UniProtKB/Swiss-Prot annotation:
UniProtKB keywords: Acetylation, DNA-directed RNA polymerase, Nucleotidyltransferase, Transcription, Transferase
Keyword Transferase: yes
Name assigned to this protein: DNA-directed RNA polymerase subunit beta
Catalytic activity: RNA(n) + a ribonucleoside 5'-triphosphate = RNA(n+1) + diphosphate
Source species: Escherichia fergusonii (strain ATCC 35469 / DSM 13698 / CCUG 18766 / IAM 14443 / JCM 21226 / LMG 7866 / NBRC 102419 / NCTC 12128 / CDC 0568-73)
Stored CDD domains: RNA_pol_B_RPB2
Subunit structure and binding partners: The RNAP catalytic core consists of 2 alpha, 1 beta, 1 beta' and 1 omega subunit. When a sigma factor is associated with the core the holoenzyme is formed, which can initiate transcription.
Gene3D superfamilies per record: 2.40.50.100, 2.40.50.150, 3.90.1100.10, 6.10.140.1670, DNA-directed RNA polymerase, beta subunit, external 1 domain, DNA-directed RNA polymerase, subunit 2, domain 6, RNA polymerase alpha subunit dimerisation domain, RNA polymerase Rpb2, domain 2
One GO molecular-function entry: DNA binding
Keyword Cytoplasm belongs to the record: no
EC number: 2.7.7.6
Amino acid sequence: MVYSYTEKKRIRKDFGKRPQVLDVPYLLSIQLDSFQKFIEQDPEGQYGLEAAFRSVFPIQSYSGNSELQYVSYRLGEPVFDVQECQIRGVTYSAPLRVKLRLVIYEREAPEGTVKDIKEQEVYMGEIPLMTDNGTFVINGTERVIVSQLHRSPGVFFDSDKGKTHSSGKVLYNARIIPYRGSWLDFEFDPKDNLFVRIDRRRKLPATIILRALNYTTEQILDLFFEKVIFEIRDNKLQMELVPERLRGETASFDIEANGKVYVEKGRRITARHIRQLEKDDVKLIEVPVEYIAGKVVAKDYIDESTGELICAANMELSLDLLAKLSQSGHKRIETLFTNDLDHGPYISETLRVDPTNDRLSALVEIYRMMRPGEPPTREAAESLFENLFFSEDRYDLSAVGRMKFNRSLLRDEIEGSGILSKDDIIDVMKKLIDIRNGKGEVDDIDHLGNRRIRSVGEMAENQFRVGLVRVERAVKERLSLGDLDTLMPQDMINAKPISAAVKEFFGSSQLSQFMDQNNPLSEITHKRRISALGPGGLTRERAGFEVRDVHPTHYGRVCPIETPEGPNIGLINSLSVYAQTNEYGFLETPYRKVIDGVVTDEIHYLSAIEEGNYVIAQANSNLDEEGHFVEDLVTCRSKGESSLFSRDQVDYMDVSTQQVVSVGASLIPFLEHDDANRALMGANMQRQAVPTLRADKPLVGTGMERAVAVDSGVTAVAKRGGVVQYVDASRIVIKVNEDEMYPGEAGIDIYNLTKYTRSNQNTCINQMPCVSLGEPVERGDVLADGPSTDLGELALGQNMRVAFMPWNGYNFEDSILVSERVVQEDRFTTIHIQELACVSRDTKLGPEEITADIPNVGEAALSKLDESGIVYIGAEVTGGDILVGKVTPKGETQLTPEEKLLRAIFGEKASDVKDSSLRVPNGVSGTVIDVQVFTRDGVEKDKRALEIEEMQLKQAKKDLSEELQILEAGLFSRIRAVLVAGGVEAEKLDKLPRDRWLELGLTDEEKQNQLEQLAEQYDELKHEFEKKLEAKRRKITQGDDLAPGVLKIVKVYLAVKRRIQPGDKMAGRHGNKGVISKINPIEDMPYDENGTPVDIVLNPLGVPSRMNIGQILETHLGMAAKGIGDKINAMLKQQQEVAKLREFIQRAYDLGADVRQKVDLSTFSDEEVMRLAENLRKGMPIATPVFDGAKEAEIKELLKLGDLPTSGQIRLYDGRTGEQFERPVTVGYMYMLKLNHLVDDKMHARSTGSYSLVTQQPLGGKAQFGGQRFGEMEVWALEAYGAAYTLQEMLTVKSDDVNGRTKMYKNIVDGNHQMEPGMPESFNVLLKEIRSLGINIELEDE
């Protein structure tokens, strides 16, 4: 395997056995591809903005003599880049400009004669743009649009499973769901009549819809029934025989023909009888006259002579009617073929309950149902019905819907119209009747072939279309108003409705969510999330068990593990590692093709529907060298079931063992040894891990860490290979390799790093370079680590030395005992950054002012503010400190004569303002790391704002000039090369100042041309620099666009360092969570023979009942990894020669049976081996992929190599007494995370504070500075103790007895410790409520 430069620094030993056929795909592609499809111009007009425009335009006037046509659109450049948008609190978006053409036709001339054409580009609002990492910046905050899993459009056949009717009869129904438009449902009732509903309204007999489609009774019967034909010959009744129809019936008369009796009366007709009848080719048999009674006529019979109707279609025959028919000369009678088994009389029965008899009455019935209370007219009824399912504007099945519809009805073509046809409706009814007759199956709506993914692009397009349709109405009216000669397209389009629709979607849709930015994993998982909730989806309350359950089709598409606990379980899922969506939006997963029993590396992506037709082997099936299956019987999946198949039946094989799980679950080592419930918690808790001060890669990982870290976008990744030319904390400069340069560019890539910025969850985002000067890098190499990444690998927590043993009850109930060393070494110290904002507004009484001159505040409180009243950067502040001084004008108060006198003498005016400064919230303390001042245009900037501006300008200038210098240096080195090649001596050249080089002339014409080109580039560079600097200067100095009424905003950023402390929540990766109970001194912790104390003591009782054994295996393997690191460390300390190191490290990498990873250290230089060893001294990182991990034997081998006991247990000694514990203890290294549930954010205390208005009781919760509720169970406790006075105090003066409270306060101040309880306010509320019921209760004071 070829390792890149960064990977060589620390290679993870991989225990995976299965070959990696397919690399993990780019993890954010579901978001990026979808949005790309939305904004890029699609010449076919299938997707995105183009499709939306084409569906609405051209817009024609009502009169038809003018129309507005769409030509093309373009997106402009965003005004601010992503970082600026976040700082300023604006949306990162680009203006949308659309070219429209207004065509005016001649009125009197023949149709289509053009009078005038005007073309113009029209602004249509802003379209939010996606950042490179798949997020949107909306009003300065990063948001993610979650994909939605909704029911695919198409037709679905379902049953109520016997739950609707008390008899338990199964009622079948069919539902046609369009992408947009009215739903059409067909359903059976318990009497077996077929009904139809439109948009889930009241039901009508299904034949009404057929009548509305202009079918007569005769035609309807013709469509749905086979015929039985009777003939009257020589006063005998004969029936045309179709032998197959008799199967299973009991003969009610002798069946005979040609004198031979085939079936005797009363006998059951069997397949043998039918074969005989067919063999003898019997066409007609004689039947008794009574047999026809009760049969149903298939058409109208009219007496030719009188024109009178003898019997209408769908009437039951009686013997009288038969006689009448015979008399009037009808010798051939067609009846409907029905039986109780597989040809039910449903449509015939439905026609009997159908009140309508022609098209008009059917249309009127439908109109009455859709618009109750409105008088129907013929035109209204017709247009309503036409618009329901047959109008392109109101109804669209979409390409997906049509494909699913045709597949469901077993048609050959998969394309077709987006509206319904007569055939569509009839075919659905036929199939539904077939299912009722026992032919065919109902659909499974939880099958992933019936649910599809709607991603960002599609949802944004729908929203945009909604906006356009709103505009369309207005445009139509404007076009009809006349006087078009002076109008331009711009005057017709109002961009407000469009931008409002888009803004509403991105800002407040249920699926537009505040990005979870705790750590890189939580970002990636949030973008790969799939929700069944949201507009057009399910609701929590209505979703039953089936929808939430794991379905066989989830395999490889949706993760069976990662889903929230609680009310959303199973409704919010995560995309599997390799899954992607196909053109129709269905999830597909990759498989390896098996050809003639040989597994190839050819990859096919299959959707859930396609997968049902194949036999698919598991990824862990054993293969030989050529790719044949080793075993004769292979475990495979087929049609949702798992069973054994012979090896020549296999069609496909899984691509990878981690194909089943999501990114979050694929990071849990030994997942295969954990119970699923705990694995779910483990996957969810990794997303809550707070990035620690120094990231520490997991010793035991799964090999997915690198993919997650790189794809999440928190690291800086090299766009092109080259050599590191410059590196400091905030930027990295790469001189690009010659072969990767574009012709005529300087070949310098500059990466500016993010420093100490705040994430959505108030954690700290900071990038640190992990390359050094002169290092070669390749494209895709990690240049700088972000939060929670370590050398380009995801590192959410810390490797801790843990022991599983009880320790004095401090690990009771999942508590965790932590050594003081962990605190000393700052292993779990995290930085949190808070943003506090102070807004100065224009009030009715005058503007608020930001100033250091605040009334009634001492000098000490102002010591940290500058003269503008804003806190200094670097100041350490605690709760209650002033950060920004602000005064608000106060209303004029009535002054006493004395005050008036003083005013007159001293001109004192200070009491007109009140202090409304921004203070640090209680319980928060930290360091000010940044201050930003935003000033409205036209408001004078204060001194601090100007200082910040000056600083930013300086920084921008410095950045740009450094960039220019680097680029110049690159350019001049190329100029020098050209000059030297052209015959100029190098020494002379170096004596000349560089600017003069370009004036030199060369005799070689080609070289001279090159030189001139380079000179042009140099001029361009300088010009570009000036332009960039000017743009930057303009951006920095221009006023900010603030909300109306806001003059100034000051934002202060506080950094808070939080050490780990009792009450913080910690967890491993296997769902093993707990709260820290005590920080124990190092000397009291259990220690081993070498005197090494453990860091954490966990309770062994937390393992067996929870069945997450993965944590034990991780502990053992972590111990082995650390043991090998210790040996390497010892060798380095002894300064042993490189060869020995190389040999030992090679042995460690080669360990394990037939692992896929082959590390060949002989290709590494000595320097590289030394660097590798240096990075391995803290432990050799190990990958144990999900379902393909290290075996127990391999762990033991590794322990042996590290000179450790293969049991994984060692003798420990009690730190307090020095005595040995009575039995060996499992000790090892486990990766522990600190979760974002910190005791600092939860701890809260109150003495007095705010009260609720109505009940006068204290509020609840930390945010409201509330009290602790003394609830009814606590009252019972005090009652049980008989503590009457304590209880009285609790319910009166300590709660809501207003007078008692104030009196008590007064008494305490006076030193008189007595109390008089009064009437609690909540009792008065109760009295008022009872009075509202009309019962008067009064309290009589005796």
